Amino acid sequence: KKNTKAAVWTKYGEALVNAYEAPTGGIQPGWPRNLITERPSLTQPAEVNGQAVTKLVFADKNIYVDEAGNVVVVEVTSPITENALDKAVDAYKKAYEMDPKTEKDVVAALQKIVTNYTNDAINDYTFGNYAKASQAFEKAANPSLVAPLKELDGSALYNAGFTAALAKDYS
């Protein structure tokens, strides 16, 4: 009896999403710097998208703060596990296949994963990494096509194409 219950897969998916989100500490762009309670190991000037910022270096992330003192970008440098969101999508898909009654929880989880992929894409775009942004926007569109969500995310697809064009990737 190996992983025969949907609950095992939903818990696994939840653990993967939590592992993905943990390094950011919940910090989001737009937050004032004074809400960051952790002390950086290094503070240095940097530039993001042509804007002068301060780079706060931590063990697992870099946080870029603008001159007004607001977070511009949170860049995770040491994820807890690689491809956590991809694995989480697979786990939730498996949970739904095993028990369609998990639909409500699976839909909410997939929507959260889409948001995380979109945030990754926006970060990559902000840094001028258009090819990576395109891939992340494409990944944001993929979970929305998974049952039970099955909604075409036109914004993610448009942004994937737009950033691919910026990266001169016409394939």
Each model region followed by its residue ranges:
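N-terminal Sec/ER secretory leader and immediately downstream segment
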Residues: 9-14, 26
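Generic structural signal for well-ordered, non-membrane alpha-helices
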Residues: 13-15, 90, 135-138
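Solenoidal tandem-repeat scaffolds enriched in leucines and small polar residues
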Residues: 133-171
